[in-house]
Structures are given as C-alpha cells and as structure tokens.
C-alpha cells in the first residue's frame, strides 16, 4: 500500500470512529477523540462532559466499549481513557450535538441557533462564535444561514490556534440538515509580546469607590430569578429537556415580524 492510500485509509477510519462514538456515547456529551499508537497498543482518549456514563457501573461500560473498538475497528490492544470537559459550552462538538437534538425534537432552527449562540457567548473565555446551518430548512429547496457573534479570526495563525470547529448532520422530516459551529476561545490566545513600564514611573493612585453588589449574579444563566438553582442534568438528554423550556423565551425573526405587523 502506498503512502497516500495509507493516509487516506487512516483518515477514513478516524472519521468512522468519530461517527461511531458520537452515536453510541451521545448521552455522555461526546466532544472529540484522540488516538495515539505505540508499541504497546493503541491509546484512545475520549473527551466527554459526563465520564460516569461512559465508564458505567463497576467499569462495565468502558470494558464493553473497549471490546467493541478492538473488534469493529481492528485496533491493537486499545486502552481507553476518559477525560472530563469542564466547560461544555466552549467545545463545538458538544454544542453541535445539543443543537442537533433540539432540531430533532421539533425546535425551530433559528430559535435553536440563537439559544446556542447565547449559551456560548455567556462564557468569559468565549471570544466569538459562528454557526452555519444548511440543508432543507423550510422547503424543498436547500438553503443555508450563517450567524456570527463576537470576534472570530478567519485566516492566519490565530485562526489555526484559537478557533475550534465541528460539523454534525441531523435527519429531519424535511431532509438532511448540516450544522457547523466555530468557536474562538480567549483562553487559547497568547500575545506575542507585552509592553513593560519604566521602573521610575510611579502609577497615579486610583480613586477609591465602592460598588453596590447585586445579590443576583447576571452571569448565572442556569439559575432561576428567585435564587433557586436550576435542576442539574444527569445526561445530555436531560440537559436538552431542561433547555427546551428556557428556549421558549427567545423570539425568532418570523415572530418579530408578526409583532411589527
């Protein structure tokens, strides 16, 4: 086998592995997978939001997954490691799956898009986001819409370093719809250099002022207005069900046009 065919086959197997994991451990909040081959075997690292669902009771789930990966994908001595994602809203893979679940449940695609953008931009490390949705959105003809918020580098070194993207496809009664989410993360941004102040320069004292703190935290989007914490989801399916009620407060363009009439 030539080198070109070997690379193509390896990339094809990697694509099949991602699709298999996205479908089989979807409820655990699958974001991505890393495969590293060494003389001892194959190390597979799964990035998920809820590792307990993948591991299962007494490790039954991860053992079954390891056996299936070795059998179906011909991996030599696979060693599966699970890593938890601290902030799911900053990972395009997780948000793509959540948005696809909302559309499968019958939510309007624009409402799901606006809700996803809002959830991402509420995080302090989110610099920008772009969601592209294409397919049979409203009729027999295919169409696409692109929604952007914040700052999102399109080209250059920064675009390769700080921008993460993922694509997922969802089947609807109208046809197949593709969802692509690109997220620019501020925590991955590194400045080339920093200006240093001269040593003999003494900064002027800042005037003292007292801020009045509000009892409610505006950044806590998952908390209720009366101060009670929102119910915590045990899986991605429960998370989608919880978001369904909160998503009703977002108006789509069609609803805004009806109000203007």
Swiss-Prot record:
Basic and acidic residues bias spans: 198-216
BP-aspect Gene Ontology terms: translation
Keyword rRNA-binding tagged: yes
Domain of life: Archaea
One Pfam family in the UniProt entry: Ribosomal_S3_C
KH type-2 domain ranges (all copies): 17-86
Region (Disordered): 198-261
Keyword Magnesium: no
SMART domains in UniProt: KH
NCBIfam families tied to this protein: PRK04191.1 (NF003219), uS3_euk_arch (TIGR01008)
Family, per entry: Belongs to the universal ribosomal protein uS3 family.
Protein name: Small ribosomal subunit protein uS3
Species name: Cenarchaeum symbiosum (strain A)
Gene: rps3
């Amino acid at each position: 086998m030539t080198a070109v065919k070997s690379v193509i086959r390896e990339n094809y197997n990697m694509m099949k592995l991602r699709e298999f994991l996205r479908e089989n451990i979807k409820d655990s909040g699958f974001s991505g997978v890393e495969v590293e081959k060494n003389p001892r075997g194959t190390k597979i690292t799964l990035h998920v939001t809820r590792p307990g669902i993948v591991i299962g009771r007494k490790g039954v789930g991860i053992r079954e997954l390891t056996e299936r990966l070795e059998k179906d994908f011909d991996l030599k001595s696979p060693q599966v490691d699970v890593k938890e994602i601290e902030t799911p809203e900053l990972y395009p893979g997780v948000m793509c799956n959540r948005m696809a679940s909302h559309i499968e449940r019958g939510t309007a695609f624009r409402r799901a898009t606006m809700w996803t953008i809002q959830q991402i931009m509420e995080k302090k490390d989110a610099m920008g986001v772009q969601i592209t949705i294409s397919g049979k959105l409203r009729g027999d003809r295919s169409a696409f819409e692109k929604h952007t918020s914040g700052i999102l580098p399109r080209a250059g070194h920064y675009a390769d370093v700080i921008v993460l993207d993922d694509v997922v496809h969802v089947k609807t009664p109208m046809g197949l719809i593709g969802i692509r989410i690109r997220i620019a993360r501020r925590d991955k941004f590194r400045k080339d250099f920093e200006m240093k102040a001269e040593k003999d320069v003494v900064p002027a004292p800042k005037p003292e002022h007292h801020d009045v703190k509000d009892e409610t935290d505006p950044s806590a989007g998952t908390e209720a207005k009366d101060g009670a914490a929102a119910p915590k989801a045990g899986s991605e399916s429960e998370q989608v069900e919880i978001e369904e009620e909160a998503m009703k407060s977002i108006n789509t363009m069609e609803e805004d046009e009806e109000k203007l009439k």
